[in-house]
Amino acid sequence: MPLADARRRPRGHRPHARSVPLLAAACALALALAGCAVGGGGAPEAPSRGDGAADIPDFSENRLQPLEGTGEPELPVTVDSVVLDPYRTSSDPLGYEQVEVDDVSRILPLTGSLAEIVFTLGLGDNVVGRDVAATFEEASGLPVISEGHEVSAESVLALEPTVILADTQTGPSEAVEQIQRSGVPVVIVEEAWSIDEMYPRFERVAEALGVPDDGAALSERTRAQMAEVREEADGSGDGPLVAFLYLRGTAGVYLLGGEGSGADAVLAETGARDAGVEMGLTTPFTPITTEALIAAQPDVLLVMTQGLESVGGVDGLVEIPGVAQTPAGAARAVVDFEDGVLLNFGPRTPQVVAALADELAAFQAEGEGR
């Protein structure tokens, strides 16, 4: 797994159920996001088209919250699409080309996050296939045609899409080029690595599908939901010290998240501190060493569910050298999130942040009670 490119991160592959404590935290989340401001007329009104916080699904239901009042696509549109360059490094600027989209009757998003955006924009009925990371209920009946950004051109073209959505990690490049040569419009958008970067992504997807106003409305609604989450979360930065571990035990992959992992942005929203960032790790992922893990002394370990299962659950995790010698390992303080959700930076990110904040607060209260 290459670590040289500081803008690449590992991705999860298959959906798994979250732990029971996290689901309980998610139930509290729905109430937090649905709550209205208390007090007199000083609270701003929610945006009319971006409204709908009261209808947010319980996170444990694994459903999306579609926008209300979405419009019909206005086509054709000509949009910018990233040019995939296998030789580009993280410091090189992206190149763009123009792509015309004139039919969105058969949409094929090649990542879970892009699928979430399309469904939330009200165009889910037009989607003909999904990436394995599109684990939400509305997409469950669709055929899986890509896994962890690895696509098969034959599988994609067999679905006869009229437009394909991808991002800068979609590959292999040979497959993408084969799809592009077929004549099907392929719109490639930038990845989102932080909260702020996800809003332009919403709008880029909406523009490509001929519904730019709905993209703006989705950004507006998600910003409002994030503001509510921040009010509920402890944003002081004095929260627990959390180490994000990317684990694939069957492949011998054990990585510690640092700056740019995506988890650092989510943790910052909860008020927690990222152990890798505090250690000075300036790349998204670094191989775990016993000494570094012990020196980090995290209070909580954050992992993806499939990764946790790949090392034998919590029992296997604490057997990894150095883990048991940390406060998190000694207390078995482990939070696991479904692979296709934690780092998606999509319409459900406010739910992710709120659920994680609740879970970390529970661990912190438990630790202070000892």
For each of these PLM feature ranges, what is it?
Residues P86-T89, E97-Q98, A115-T120, T135-A139, ...:
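Short, solvent-exposed loop/turn elements at domain surfaces
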Residues P172-E174, V187-R204, G237-A265, E309-G312:
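Extracytoplasmic ligand-binding site segments that recognize negatively charged/polar headgroups
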Residues G257-P284:
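His/Asp/Glu-enriched short active-site or ligand-binding loop at hydrolase and phosphoryl-transfer sites
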Residues E68-R88, S105-L159, V163-T168, A275:
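A short, structured surface patch at a secondary-structure boundary
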Residues E197, E203-E207, V300-R370:
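Structured C-terminal subdomain patch of bacterial secreted/periplasmic proteins
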Residues V104, S152-Q169, V184, T289-V303:
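Proline-aspartate-enriched helix->loop->beta-strand connector
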Residues P2-C27, A34-L110, D213-A243, A361-R370:
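Bacterial Sec-exported substrate-binding components of ABC uptake systems
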Residues P76, V101-V104, T111-V118, G124-D125, ...:
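Extracytoplasmic/secreted envelope proteins and their assembly/folding machinery
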